[in-house]
Design a protein with these regions (language model features):
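Conserved glycine-rich cofactor-binding loop
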Residues: 11-12
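Conserved glycine-rich Rossmann-like NAD(P)H-binding loop of the short-chain dehydrogenase/reductase
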Residues: 25-41
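The beta1-alpha1 cofactor-binding region of Rossmann-like NAD(H)/NADP(H)-dependent oxidoreductases
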Residues: 54-65, 95
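Conserved NAD(P)H cofactor-binding loop of Rossmann-fold oxidoreductase domains
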Residues: 81-86
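Substrate-binding pocket helix/loop in short-chain dehydrogenase/reductase
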Residues: 89-90, 97-102
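Residue(s) in the substrate-gating loop at a strand-loop-helix junction
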Residues: 133
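C-terminal helical subdomain
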Residues: 176, 193-229
Length: 255
């Protein structure tokens, strides 16, 4: 029986690459995103059965509609990937865009994490991967304040749930992918250019799948970022935040 995976934010970037690599491994897929045309174009190039589920996960009702669709179905893997960012001084960035970001990056992820984890635990197997960011591992992110805050939520929530399931001796895997810069259309949406060289989506997803196989709770695919995270543990918090601000300002100047 083929395995079944659900991928949100599947129309581009990391989500689309998860679809390609999982299809190559024989997974049947449900692809979720706002842009139906992109989902259909992606599915046409895949080798396994793909269901298209257009949804705007910024809306609570759409999240619950997806959950309802999944009730009673065997889920082997759920990739919680939908999300976006923004860059600029907090006093200048657009409030409506930030509230939509919080709706997608936090509320939608929270709803789907809770409801899908319940399904996985009830069926007694499966894996849930939340796509966070290395931003969520840092104390704060001046000039990307809201985005960093949303990703800190993702890392914290995922880590807590993973520990609860371990203590309950559940076979269900829960993990968080925390990439640094990845060469996708994230830049255009966030109105930013990376200060560090990005990795490819292909490499990012390979590392994610390998980390899941090893049941790592937090997966950091970029070795430069991973080294920075390790060194950052020895820095005073204010110093770390100043360094983060310096790196973020580079992005602003590149625009």
């Amino acid at each position: 029986m083929p395995k079944f995976a659900v991928i949100t934010g599947a129309s581009s970037g990391i989500g689309a690459e998860f679809a390609r690599q999982l299809s190559a491994r024989g997974y049947e897929l449900m692809l979720v995103a706002r842009r139906e045309d992109r989902l259909r174009k992606l599915s046409a190039g895949l080798t396994t059965t793909c269901e298209i589920f257009p949804a705007d996960l910024a809306k609570k009702s759409e999240c619950l509609r997806l959950v309802k669709e999944l009730q009673g179905r065997r889920i082997d893997l759920f990739i919680n990937n939908a999300g976006f960012g923004d860059c600029g001084m907090f006093l200048d960035t657009d409030l409506d865009k930030e509230l939509e970001m919080i709706s997608v990056n936090v509320r939608a992820l929270h709803i789907l994490t809770k409801q899908v984890a319940r399904i996985l635990c009830k069926q007694g197997h499966g894996a849930l991967l939340n796509v966070g960011s290395c931003a969520g591992l840092m104390p704060a992110g001046p000039y990307m304040a809201t985005y960093y805050a949303t990703k800190a939520y993702v890392v914290s929530l995922t880590s807590a749930l993973a520990q609860e399931l371990r203590e309950a001796r559940s076979p269900v895997y829960v993990g968080c992918l925390c990439p640094g810069p990845v060469n996708t259309e994230f830049n255009a949406v966030a109105n930013v250019e990376f200060a560090l060289r990005g990795i490819t989506p292909e490499y990012c997803v390979r590392c994610a799948l390998d980390g899941m196989a090893r049941r790592k709770t937090v997966i950091v695919p970029n070795p430069v970022v991973a080294a920075g995270m390790t060194l950052g543990r020895f820095l005073p918090r204010p110093v770390y935040i100043k360094i983060a601000a310096h790196q973020q300002r580079k992005k602003l100047y590149k625009r």
